[in-house]
C-alpha cells in the first residue's frame, strides 16, 4: 500500500498538486518529536484513504486537496520579541497569543512554509499521553487552624479567588460544590467535545446546572476539586475542602498542547468578575519528555504564568517506586552498552496488555554520534532475537518502520530534536503492537561515546523489565518527576502521609497493606509517601518544591460513575439524589491541598505574585525528620524527595499577615485575628501587627480560670485541668479585644 501511495504522491507533486511531502516535513528541526509521530499517523491515514478510494484523475486531485486541508492545532513558538499575531497574515487562525507563543489552527498544506520562516522556532501539535496522577490532612497542614474547629473564627476561606481545576471526571453539581442556594460554585465549564478541535465553554448558571459529567468512567476531577474547594455542610455530614468559598472553573486535560487556550478564557473570566486572582491545579502528568524548559508544553505554560501572574500547582507524579528511568555515563569501553527491556504483561496474567510504548531519551554531547538499536530480547537469556538499527551514522536522527515477524508485529519510530542544556532528545515510539511472543520482550541497546550521559524516561504505561538478563543496570528513581512539572514558574507538589488507614462505607477499616500490598516503606504517618516522585534536573533544580497530604484523602466522588465503589467512605442522600464521598491517594490529592492553600494566602494578600507564593510555601514548610530521611529508593546525590518540606498553611498565612502589617498595609479587623486549638486543651491566638498580647479564659458564668501575657503577635493560654465544656476566651493586643467561645475537651 505504501509503495502505491508513494507513487501517487510523487506523481501529484510532479504535477504541482497539493500533496504533502511528509518525509521532508519530518526532517524539519522545527517540528518537535511528538508532532513528527503525529505526522506519521496523518500520513498513514492519508495512505489508507487514497488507496481505498481507488480514485484517479481529477477525483484523486480533489481527494488529495481534501487531505491537504486537514488541520492541526499547534503551539507555535517564535523568536523572542516577535509578534506571534502576524501569523494571521498567512491565513492561519490564531486563538491565543502569549508573548512570542501562539496557539493556532494550521492546514497541513501550510506546515512546510511555516517551518521555513526564520522567526519560527518550533511547532508542536502532537498528542501527548497523560495520566491522572481530607479529615486528618487538614490538621497536619494547618488548614484547620485557619478555618476549622467548633466555635473558632473562620477568617480565610479563599473568598475572592478563583481556582481552575484542569482534570477529568467532573461532577460540578455535586453537593460538595453547591452554595447556600443549592447552585453550583463552578462558574465556567470548559470541555473538549472533539479531539484536536477548539474547546467549548459553558458560563451561564442554566448551562452549568444542566451539565452532568465530562467522563462517566472517571471521578478524579470531582475528588480533586473537593479537596481544593469543596464544602458539604449537610445536617448529618460535613466535609470541607481547603478553600470552601473560592470560585471554581473547570477544564479538560490538555492532551494536545493547543488545549492550553483555556487558560486565556479562565484569566478573562477572572478579570471580568472582580479582577480575581487565579490558582490553577494540574493533577496529571507524563514521564516521556525532555524534563526541561524546552518542552513546548512546559515553555508555553511558563510564559502564560508569567504574563498573567497565575499561581499554578502541578503534581510531582506517583512513580518514585517504579523502574521507569535509566541513566548511564559512558566511560569509553569497547563493549559498553546501556540495555533495557520493557514489560508487556503488567498484571501478570501471561497476556500482553501493553499495545504502545513511549520512551524519551536525552543525550549529552550530541556532536558525538550515539547508536540506538531496537531489540526483541529473549526474556530468559537476555540475548537478542531481532535487532533493528534506528539511530547511527546512517540514520543520525532516527527513522520509522513497521515490522511483522514470528516474534513481533508493530510499528517502531525514533525521532530526534535539539533540547536545552546542549543536549539532544530522541522519542522512541513502539505502537500498534499486535503480537509479542510470551518469551520475548521489546527493548533497546544504546552505545555512546566517552563522557556522554544518556537518560531514558519511560512513560509508565510500561516499566523496565529488570529481570531480563543484562537489562537491570543503571536504573534510578531520581528523574521520576513529572516531565510536565519541569518549568521554572509553577509550584511542584509531592505527597506525605497523614493517615495509614481509612474506614469504608461498609464499616470496615482498611490499612495501608490492604491498599498497597507488599510495600513496607513510606507507609507510616509522617513519611514522605513511597510513590511521591522527585528528581534533580539537568539545570540543577530539584523538584518537588514542597509536599502536602496525599494518602487516603477523603473527598467527593462523581455520581455518574461506579468505578470507585470499593473506595467509598460515605453515602449521603439529599432531595432524592445520592452523593458519594471516598478516598484516593496520590500527588494528585496533595496538589489540590497546595492549590487551596494558595487561594487562602491570596485572599489574605492578593498583591503577592506567583513567585512570592512559592517562596512563602518553601520558607514556612516543616522540614522534620521524615523529610531528611531518604526513602527506600533514593541514593547519594539524588534530588530530595521531600523538597523544602511539608507545607504549613497557618505558618504561611501568619508570615503574609506579618509582612503586611510591617509595611502598614491595611488589614480588615475581622482578618487580623486568628485562634486555633492546640493539643492538651491549649489555645493559641494571633493578631497581625500586635507587639504585645494578653489572654484570659473564663467559665460561662464569668469566673477566671487561666490567663497569660507576653510580647509579640502570638499568645497561648492553657485550659489543662478544667472540666469539659464551653468557655469564654478574651484576647487583647492593647488596641482591640476579641471575645470567642471555645470548647475544652
Name the predicted role of every residue range.
Residues 246, 267-292, 315-316, 445-450, ...:
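Short acidic, glycine-rich surface-loop motifs adjacent to enzyme active sites
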Residues 225-228, 249-255, 309, 358-380, ...:
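Hydrolase catalytic cores
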Residues 154-156, 169-222, 226, 378-462, ...:
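Active-site core segment of subtilase-fold serine proteases
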Residues 61-64, 277-281, 310, 314, ...:
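C-terminal subdomain of the subtilisin-like protease fold in secreted/lumenal serine endopeptidases
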Residues 5, 18-154, 161-163, 175, ...:
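Autoinhibitory N-terminal propeptides
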Residues 20-21, 149-259, 274-277, 289, ...:
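Subtilisin-like serine protease catalytic core
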Residues 193-206, 373-392, 405-407, 412, ...:
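Catalytic-core environment of secreted peptidases
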Residues 666-745:
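C-terminal outer-membrane/trafficking sorting elements
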Amino acid at each position: 500500500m505504501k509503495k502505491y501511495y508513494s507513487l501517487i504522491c510523487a506523481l501529484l507533486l510532479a504535477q504541482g498538486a497539493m500533496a504533502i511531502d511528509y518525509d521532508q516535513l519530518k526532517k524539519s528541526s522545527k517540528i518537535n518529536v511528538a508532532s513528527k509521530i503525529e505526522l506519521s499517523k496523518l500520513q498513514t491515514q492519508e495512505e489508507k484513504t487514497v488507496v481505498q478510494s481507488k480514485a484517479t484523475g481529477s477525483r484523486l486531485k480533489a481527494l488529495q486537496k481534501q487531505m491537504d486541508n486537514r488541520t492541526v492545532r499547534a503551539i507555535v513558538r517564535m523568536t523572542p520579541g516577535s509578534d506571534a499575531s502576524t501569523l494571521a497574515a498567512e491565513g492561519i487562525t490564531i486563538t491565543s497569543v502569549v508573548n512570542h507563543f501562539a496557539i493556532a489552527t494550521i492546514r497541513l498544506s501550510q506546515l512546510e512554509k511555516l517551518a521555513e520562516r526564520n522567526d519560527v522556532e518550533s511547532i508542536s501539535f502532537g498528542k501527548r499521553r497523560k495520566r491522572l496522577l481530607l479529615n486528618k490532612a487538614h490538621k497536619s497542614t494547618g488548614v484547620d487552624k485557619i478555618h476549622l474547629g467548633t466555635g473558632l473564627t473562620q477568617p480565610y476561606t479563599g473568598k475572592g479567588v478563583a481556582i481552575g481545576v484542569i482534570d477529568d471526571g467532573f461532577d460540578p453539581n455535586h453537593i460538595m460544590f453547591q452554595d447556600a442556594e443549592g447552585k453550583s460554585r463552578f462558574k465556567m465549564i470548559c470541555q473538549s467535545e472533539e479531539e484536536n478541535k477548539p474547546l467549548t465553554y459553558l458560563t451561564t448558571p442554566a448551562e452549568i446546572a444542566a451539565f452532568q459529567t465530562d467522563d462517566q468512567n472517571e471521578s478524579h476531577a470531582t475528588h480533586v476539586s473537593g479537596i481544593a474547594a469543596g464544602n458539604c455542610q449537610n445536617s448529618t455530614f460535613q466535609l470541607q475542602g481547603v478553600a470552601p468559598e473560592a470560585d471554581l472553573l473547570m477544564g479538560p486535560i490538555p492532551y494536545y498542547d493547543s488545549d492550553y487556550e483555556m487558560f486565556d478564557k479562565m484569566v478573562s473570566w477572572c478579570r471580568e468578575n472582580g479582577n480575581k486572582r487565579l490558582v490553577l491545579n494540574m493533577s496529571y502528568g507524563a514521564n516521556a519528555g525532555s524534563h526541561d524548559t524546552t518542552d513546548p508544553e512546559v515553555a508555553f505554560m511558563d510564559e502564560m504564568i508569567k504574563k498573567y501572574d497565575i499561581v499554578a500547582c502541578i503534581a510531582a507524579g506517583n512513580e518514585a517506586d517504579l523502574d521507569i528511568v535509566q541513566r548511564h555515563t559512558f566511560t569509553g569501553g569497547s563493549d559498553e552498552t546501556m540495555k533495557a527491556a520493557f514489560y508487556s504483561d503488567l498484571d501478570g496474567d501471561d497476556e500482553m496488555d501493553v499495545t504502545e510504548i513511549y520512551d524519551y531519551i536525552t543525550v549529552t554531547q550530541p556532536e558525538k554520534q550515539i547508536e540506538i538499536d531496537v531489540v526483541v530480547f529473549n526474556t530468559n537469556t537476555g540475548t537478542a532475537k531481532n535487532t533493528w538499527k534506528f539511530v547511527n551514522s546512517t540514520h543520525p536522527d532516527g527513522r520509522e518502520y513497521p515490522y511483522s515477524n514470528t516474534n513481533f508485529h508493530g510499528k517502531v519510530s525514533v525521532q530526534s530534536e535539539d533540547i536545552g542544556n546542549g543536549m539532544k532528545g530522541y522519542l522512541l515510539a513502539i505502537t500498534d503492537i499486535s503480537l509479542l511472543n510470551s518469551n520475548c520482550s521489546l527493548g533497546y541497546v544504546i552505545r555512546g561515546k566517552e563522557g556522554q550521559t544518556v537518560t531514558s524516561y519511560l512513560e509508565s504505561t510500561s516499566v523496565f523489565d529488570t529481570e531480563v538478563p543484562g537489562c537491570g543496570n543503571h536504573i534510578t528513581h531520581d528523574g521520576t518527576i513529572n516531565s510536565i512539572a519541569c518549568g521554572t514558574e509553577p509550584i511542584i507538589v509531592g505527597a506525605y502521609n497523614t493517615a495509614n488507614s481509612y474506614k469504608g462505607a461498609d464499616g470496615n477499616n482498611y490499612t495501608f497493606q490492604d491498599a498497597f500490598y507488599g510495600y513496607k516503606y513510606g507507609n507510616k504517618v509522617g513519611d514522605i509517601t513511597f510513590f511521591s516522585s522527585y528528581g534533580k534536573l539537568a539545570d540543577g533544580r530539584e523538584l518537588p518544591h514542597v509536599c502536602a497530604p496525599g494518602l487516603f484523602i477523603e473527598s467527593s466522588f462523581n455520581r455518574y460513575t461506579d468505578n470507585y465503589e470499593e473506595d467509598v467512605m460515605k453515602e449521603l442522600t439529599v432531595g432524592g439524589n445520592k452523593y458519594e464521598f471516598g478516598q484516593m491517594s496520590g500527588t494528585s490529592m496533595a496538589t489540590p491541598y497546595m492549590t487551596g492553600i494558595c487561594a487562602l494566602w491570596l485572599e489574605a494578600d492578593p498583591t503577592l505574585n506567583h513567585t512570592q507564593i512559592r517562596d512563602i510555601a518553601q520558607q514556612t514548610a516543616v522540614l522534620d525528620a521524615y523529610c531528611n530521611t531518604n526513602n527506600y529508593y533514593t541514593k547519594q546525590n539524588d534530588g530530595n524527595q521531600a523538597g523544602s518540606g511539608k507545607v504549613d498553611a497557618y505558618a504561611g498565612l501568619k508570615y503574609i499577615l506579618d509582612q503586611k502589617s510591617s509595611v502598614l498595609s491595611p488589614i480588615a479587623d475581622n482578618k487580623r485575628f486568628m485562634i486555633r486549638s492546640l493539643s492538651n486543651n491549649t489555645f493559641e491566638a494571633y493578631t497581625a501587627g500586635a507587639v504585645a498580647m494578653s489572654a484570659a479564659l473564663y467559665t460561662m458564668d464569668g469566673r477566671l480560670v487561666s490567663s497569660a501575657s507576653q510580647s509579640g503577635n502570638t499568645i497561648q493560654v492553657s485550659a489543662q485541668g478544667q472540666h469539659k465544656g464551653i468557655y469564654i476566651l478574651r484576647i487583647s493586643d492593647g488596641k482591640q479585644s476579641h471575645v470567642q467561645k471555645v470548647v475544652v475537651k
